[in-house]
Regions:
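Periplasmic peptidoglycan-binding/anchoring modules of Gram-negative envelope and division proteins
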Residues: 91-102, 106, 113-148, 173-177, ...
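Extracytoplasmic/periplasm-facing segments of secreted or lipoprotein envelope proteins
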Residues: 111-112, 198
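Extracytoplasmic/secreted proteins, especially bacterial periplasmic and envelope-associated proteins
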Residues: 41, 76, 123-130, 158, ...
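Periplasmic OmpA-like peptidoglycan-binding domain that tethers envelope proteins to the cell wall
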Residues: 150-223
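N-terminal targeting leaders that direct proteins to extracytoplasmic destinations
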Residues: 2-102
Length: 223
């Protein structure tokens, strides 16, 4: 009788251990993919207001009615920065971009790079690839997008400014080379540590991000 009880006890323990291991693996896999987004999520976030479906769970920029004159001025400004080198943008132009994008469809992507470099890390490639597919989606293709690099507060201002610009350029090169996106449709800008997403935690990973903004719809971009 004691042998049977011991056997049952051992079987129960092994079952619990196996279940625990399975749960551990499952949880780890879910956590590993937390920061990667899908093509569909990006398309929904960047779609113009008239095409944006009513969904929950994804933060997007506010959609407001603007004065036609303001819209025309913004469009004219966007045309002046299309095709420009990232480092050629003045501080005034960078701030003008930051002002305009506040009311545009946008998404923040937590793109990791190799330490102290602009090389996209392997674990973040799925997000960049999803971005490439999204920007060639029929709902978005042909628009002009801002690709803005941001860093955390570690390091000096000049260092972070340069790093954010190089990382934005790295994303642009990947999208142009791998997905055939017109380079003039991607406006790259770096903000260094000047626009932290979470100022209360300046060193937090959430601040190290690439923000993608849809500056104008296809009808406007094609004019």
């Amino acid at each position: 009788m004691s042998k049977i009880s011991a056997t049952k006890g051992l079987t129960a323990i092994l079952s619990i251990m196996t279940l625990g291991a399975a749960l551990s693996v499952g949880t780890g896999a879910a956590r590993a993919g937390d920061n990667n987004v899908t093509e569909d999520q990006i398309v929904r976030a960047l779609a113009p207001a008239e095409k944006k479906p009513l969904t929950r769970g994804l933060s997007v920029g506010p959609q407001t009615q603007t004065d036609p004159a303001v819209t025309a001025a913004e469009t004219k400004f966007v045309q002046t920065i299309r095709g420009r080198n990232t480092r050629s943008l003045s501080i005034t132009e960078r701030e003008e971009i930051a002002t305009i994008v506040k009311d545009k469809p946008k998404i923040d992507l937590e793109i990791n790079f190799d330490y102290n470099s602009a090389d996209i890390s392997a674990k973040s490639l799925p997000s960049v690839q999803a971005l490439g597919r999204a920007l060639t989606n029929a709902d978005l293709k042909g628009s002009t997008f801002v690709v803005a690099g941001h860093t955390d507060a570690a390091g000096g201002e000049a260092y972070n400014q340069d790093l954010s610009e190089r990382r934005a350029d790295s994303i642009k090169r990947y999208l142009v080379d791998k997905y055939g996106i017109n380079g003039s449709d991607l406006v790259t800008v770096g903000y260094g540590k000047s626009k932290l997403k979470d100022p209360s935690q300046p060193m937090a990973e959430v601040n190290r991000r690439v923000q993608v903004v849809n500056m104008e719809n296809k009808a406007t971009a094609s004019k």
